[in-house]
Structures are given as C-alpha cells and as structure tokens.
A protein has these predicted regions:
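Membrane-embedded alpha-helical bundles of multi-pass transporters/translocases
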Residues: 7-221, 225-315
Length: 315
C-alpha cells in the first residue's frame, strides 16, 4: 500500500468516525422517547386500578386515540418535510420533548375525585397529545435531523446501530427501577423521573446542529401524497410491514404485563427484579451486525419471532 493510499484510508476512517460523546448526545433524545413509550404500558393499569375506570371504556378511549394517531403520522411527516428555519428542518421539532414529558406527567396525575366523564376526557386528551402529537413529531423529525447532522452513510449507520445499544440499556434500567418505584410510591414515580428524562432528552437539540444538505434536497426533490398512494396499493412488502406494525402496536399497547405481576404473581415490585435478567440480552446487541450478515434481515426476523413466541408461551 502506497503512502497516498494509507493517507486516503486514514482520512476516510476519520470522516466515518463518530465520537462516543456525540453518539450519546444524539441518542439521548431517542432513549427519552423510548422510555416515555414504555411508560404508556402502565397507562391501562393506572386507569383501571387507580381511576377505577371500566377496562372496556379505557380500551375504547385508547382505540379512538390510535385511530387519530394514524392520521397525525402522515400530517407530521409532511409538515417536517416542508419546514425551513434557521435551526434547520428537523431540529426545531425536538422542542416537543418538553411537551412529551409534561403530558406524560399529567396523564398519570388525573384527580381521582373527578367524575367518570371528566376522567375520560382528561385521559383521552393527555394520551392523545402525548402519543399522537409529541411522539409522532419526535419520530417524524428523526431521520430528517440525522441526515443533516451527519454527512455520510457510515456515520449514520453507526449512529443507528450503536445508538440502539444505549437505548436498549436505558430501557433495561427503566424496566428494573420503574415497577419497583411504582410499587412503593405509586404514580409519584412518574414525576420523579419526568424531570431528569426531560433534561436528558433535550441534550440533542442543544448540542447537535444541522450542518449538511442532503443530495435529494439539493436536487429539489419532494415527496407528495399522490406518490405514496400507489406504493401502498401495489407494494406487498409495504402492506405486510404496515400489518406487522399494526399487530405490534396492539400487543405492546395492552399493558398486560403489569396486571400479570400484580394479580398473578401478587407483587408488582417483583416485575423490576425479574427485569434484571434482561441485562443478559445486552451483549447480544454487539453481535447483531455479525448475525445480520450471516442470516440476513429476514432470517433475523424469523429467529426473533420464534424466540419471542417461545418466551410468551413459557410464561
């Protein structure tokens, strides 16, 4: 290898490098959003056991909210795509992090003295604003922000790949601590973690600017709704992905794990203790790139589904 080739390779590695500090700062927002989403798993339990609302009524409220969410996803994407500010295109929407945790705290702070109708209005408004507005915009801006903060695909791949490890670690810590805190101090646990997680979630908007313009934007390319409709109609893989996400949202939104530990096991605090075992999965995250090369994404998906089914059947 010539001296010029060595220099070129060194410069390439330098261009592809993402420092640990920037990696943590970027994923601070994603981790905060993920933890707020995990907290929604306790919303059904809170509504039925604390507010004494009928399970069928709670399910109906959440179902209507999810239907509304399907429309806000489309609207948020088009709003973000057409944004032009001095802070950039995707970065300004990180401000929804403040409203996300405010609405999360309010969701679990409904006065128990309210009448049933008032409780329903409170829960529906807070749940919808949190999930259908705040989380939607924080998801819609994510890729738009990333491609303007990191210029090359190698950096973007590292941000997504290694960043998921930090998000997974944060979720594990949450799953261990939050059920125990809920068992001891009730819904006050939400307020205890809302402030620090808001601060963590705001690190990205305060430290990482948008510095680059994607090629598609330089060429003046824009996505229109009429371009998406034929894709949904003719592309079978897209329809399959939509169905998978639909089933996934139903399964994750049930929140049955809380009921299982409270009424079958008899101790909600033990849910956090049992979650300690999930730390065994963390080293596997470092092996995912190798496994993905060996089995492919389809093979990895099948393996994950089979392992998940075995786990659910065993419990």
């Amino acid at each position: 290898m010539t001296k010029e080739e060595k220099l070129a390779r060194k410069q390439q590695r330098k261009a592809e490098k993402v420092g640990l500090g920037k990696l943590l700062l970027w994923n601070s927002s994603s981790c905060s959003v993920a933890l707020s989403t995990l907290m929604l798993g306790y919303a059904t339990f809170y509504c039925t056991d604390v507010l004494q609302l009928a399970p069928a009524l709670v399910g109906t409220l959440f179902m209507v909210s999810k239907i509304f969410d399907s429309f806000t996803d489309i609207v948020a994407g088009f709003i973000v795509d057409r944004t032009q500010t001095r802070w950039g295109k995707g970065r300004p929407y990180e401000i929804f992090m403040l409203f996300l945790w405010l609405s999360t705290w309010l969701l679990f702070s409904c006065p128990t003295s309210f009448a049933t109708a008032a409780k329903c209005i409170w829960i529906f408004c807070m749940y919808t604003f949190m999930n259908s507005i705040c989380v939607t915009f924080l998801n819609a801006n994510n890729v738009v922000y990333m491609v303007r903060a990191f210029e090359n695909k190698e950096q973007q791949s590292k941000i997504v790949g290694y960043g998921s490890i930090f998000t997974m670690a944060g979720a594990m810590v949450f799953n261990v601590l939050f059920p125990t805190a809920m068992a001891k101090v009730g819904t006050d646990a939400v307020g205890m973690i809302a402030i620090p997680l808001t601060a963590i979630g705001m690190l990205r908007i305060l430290t990482i600017p948008e510095k680059f313009t994607p090629v598609s934007e330089k060429n003046g390319e824009q996505t229109h709704l009429k371009d998406l409709l034929p894709l949904l109609k003719e592309s079978r893989p897209v329809l399959i992905i939509c169905m998978v996400r639909f089933v996934q949202n139903i399964a994750t939104g049930l929140g049955v794990g809380t009921y299982y530990w409270q009424y079958i096991i008899g101790n909600l605090g033990m849910m956090g203790v049992a979650s300690v075992t999930t730390i065994l999965v963390l080293p596997l995250a470092f092996a995912l790139p190798v496994l993905r090369k060996k089995f492919g994404m389809a093979g990895m998906s099948v393996i994950g589904i089979l392992v998940g089914c075995i786990g659910y059947l065993a419990t």
